[in-house]
Regions:
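Helix-loop module immediately N-terminal to the HCX5R catalytic loop
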Residues: 1-6, 44-47, 174, 181
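A short glycine-rich beta-strand->turn/loop micro-motif centered on a GG-aromatic cluster
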Residues: 28-43, 83
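Conserved small/polar residues in nucleotide/adenosyl-binding loops
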Residues: 216-218
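Conserved phosphate-donor/acceptor-positioning beta-strand/loop module used by diverse small-molecule
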Residues: 125, 143-165
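Activity-critical C-terminal alpha-helical subdomain
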Residues: 156-187, 191, 195, 199
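Conserved nucleotide-sensing/catalytic segment adjacent to the nucleotide-binding pocket
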Residues: 76-143
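Catalytic cysteine-centered active loop of the rhodanese-like fold, especially the PTP/DSP P-loop
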Residues: 2-35
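Glycine-rich phosphate-binding P-loop
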Residues: 17, 56-76
Length: 219
């Protein structure tokens, strides 16, 4: 229940609007605090932090399905960038997810990293600077380039199985979304391959569908 949690109330600049709401909620028995300076001050604080956040990193690389994300989620002191962005950083990366905007991503990134010791190694998955529609902070992206790198490998069979588990169409709507993405691949794969992929998808031959995409380095 909300009354047992500490709530933070804010407005643009931390003025009377949030102050009035804070007082009202407090009088109703809620544990509540007002964000000093409001959202604008918070955003400045977040951006100032991200501008200089360059921790030592261990960066995991490897093809889709080798288990990078599984390993990241099992390691203490790791940052799951794809989870923060709610995007898997591929053309099908938004399937089953709700991608976040830049401000939300930066806020979550700040919450995840601001309490970490600056000299402590952090595990992270190798990404381009853009994950879906959001950009990794420039300083952190620079730290990723300079970090220690580990290459993970797995058999084709294992990778296809893992990709299938993560991207498997769970309903007609998801199937439609995946099919709607295929025309964007015509330039890189050619019309014939895209038509083949569309047929495999419609026939529920998902392993064959993923195998072709994997061989073409699309997923």
């Amino acid at each position: 229940p909300f009354q047992s949690r500490l709530l933070t109330v804010y407005c643009a600049r931390g003025g009377m609007r949030s102050k009035s709401v804070t007082r009202f909620l407090s009088s109703e028995g809620f544990r509540v605090q007002q964000l000093e300076g409001g959202y604008k001050a918070y955003r400045r604080h977040v951006l100032d932090f991200l501008k200089d956040f360059r921790p030592p990193l261990i960066v995991l690389h490897g093809r889709t399905g080798v288990g990078k994300t599984l390993l990241i989620r099992s390691l203490p002191g790791s940052i799951d960038l794809e989870n923060l962005a709610q995007h898997r950083s591929s053309i099908f990366g938004a399937v089953h997810l709700q991608p976040r905007n830049q401000k939300n991503f930066e806020g979550l990134f700040f919450s995840k990293t601001s309490s970490k010791p600056r000299k402590e190694f952090i595990f992270v998955e190798g990404e381009s600077r853009k994950v879906g529609k959001v950009f990794i902070p420039e300083a952190f992206a620079d730290a990723m380039k300079k970090g220690k790198k580990i290459l993970l490998k797995a058999s084709m069979e294992t990778r296809v199985r893992r990709i299938l588990e993560e991207y498997h169409p769970r309903d007609e709507e998801t199937l439609f979304k995946i099919e709607a993405i295929l025309p964007a691949l015509k330039e890189s794969l050619g019309k014939n391959v895209v038509e083949q992929l569309k047929t495999l998808l419609q026939q529920n031959k998902f392993e064959d569908f993923i195998t072709i995409l994997d061989r073409k380095s699309v997923v």
